[in-house]
Regions:
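Hydrophobic alpha-helical transmembrane segments
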Residues: 1, 54-58, 113-117
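Extracytoplasmic catalytic-loop and juxtamembrane helix elements of membrane-embedded
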Residues: 1-23, 87-97, 149-160
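Intrinsically disordered, polar/acidic, low-complexity terminal segments
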Residues: 5-6, 29-44, 48-66, 122-178
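Alpha-helical transmembrane segments of polytopic membrane proteins
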Residues: 8-17, 21, 32-46, 98-105
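Hydrophobic/aromatic-rich transmembrane helices and adjacent perimembrane loops
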Residues: 22, 93-117
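Transmembrane alpha-helix segments characteristic
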Residues: 60-87
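Hydrophobic membrane-spanning alpha-helices of multi-pass integral membrane proteins
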Residues: 71-78, 103-113, 127-137
């Protein structure tokens, strides 16, 4: 049997997993704050998409820039949907993997820039301020997580270095460390 992952669990499960993917853009706290983190990032991303479509129609001279932002937002959205579809057959928290953080993070960067530049006047300072407050609040937990990940990587690298120095053959290195 060549199947690696479980079959998709359906549209609603795929959308849930896609929102989980987007929630990871907040780092590890996005996992802790699920499902609110997914709703937060999903709504902001949808709002940015709507603002971009409005800018496309109302600012023809800005269409190249708007198209670029739409491409980035669309790419992250496509990653979220593809991950949602591909992982929805796994457990209920399959989309909340830390490895998705760097793939999902550009969505919030685009949200920040798009709302600050093209958004309605009332939101131009409110949304960036809210995002600043959220990221300031999450900075320390994310920093602690990164420090711990660095320590773990250093320990694994030290074991690997000892095995190489001891003359362990490549096939055993692969079997032990991969």
């Amino acid at each position: 049997d060549l199947r690696h992952h479980a079959a998709p669990a359906g549209v609603f499960a795929a959308l849930r997993t896609a929102l989980q993917f987007l929630a990871t853009s907040l780092g590890r706290p996005g996992v802790w704050l699920w499902p609110w983190s997914g709703v937060f990032v999903g709504c902001l991303s949808a709002a940015a998409g709507a603002v971009l479509l409005g800018a496309w129609c109302s600012r023809p001279k800005e269409r190249a820039r708007v198209a670029g932002f739409l491409c980035v937002l669309g790419a992250v959205g496509a990653l979220a949907l593809a991950t949602g579809w591909g992982r929805s057959g796994e457990d209920d928290l399959a989309g909340l993997q830390p490895r998705y953080t760097t793939l999902a993070a550009p969505a919030l960067a685009v949200v920040y820039i798009v709302i600050a530049y093209y958004g309605p006047v009332v939101l131009r300072s409110l949304v960036p301020m809210v995002l600043f407050a959220v990221f300031s609040t999450l900075l320390w937990p994310n920093t602690q997580e990164a420090i711990e990940a660095g320590r773990n990587a250093r320990e694994r690298a030290a074991v690997f270095d000892r095995d190489v120095a001891a003359g362990m053959p490549p096939y055993r290195l692969v079997r032990r460390h991969v």
